[in-house]
Amino acid sequence: MKTFKQFNEQSYSGTPFGTIHPMADLNAAAGDAKISKQDLDNVEKYADRLYKAVGIDVEFTRHFLDRVNDERNKKQITVAELIRMFKQSFKKYGKKIAQLGPDAEAVINDMQTDVNMPFALRWDNKNQELDLVAKTVMRKKNFATSNQKFQFK
């Protein structure tokens, strides 16, 4: 796909656009931006508010941040997709996830976007609550696991 600058250099016969610097690339894909630590912190705050109703605190590993921006995902995983994943999983499986108890492992699978998030539940003695530790995230069709899968469309 041509960028705004490439398109205009080829179609404009006046002053070359190489001398003018556009403020923004209007044709750039919106989903190409990498997710920052701050973005992930905001997603975590949102997920914490959702899952607080069932006594779960959401945490992300450092590997999660690395993997969310990994090239192997082919299409960049967006903040909106992560928020959707937490919202839909809570709506459909919130109480069921809380009943798994400590030391349980499972995968949340969004079949619409093919985003998979393996997680572990750990008991937090300090706060007396379950921690949902999101270990990693990846975009992959037909994700195979031996752990329980919580799927939604």
Spans of model-derived segments:
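Ribonuclease/tRNase effector modules and their secretory precursors
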Residues: 2-153
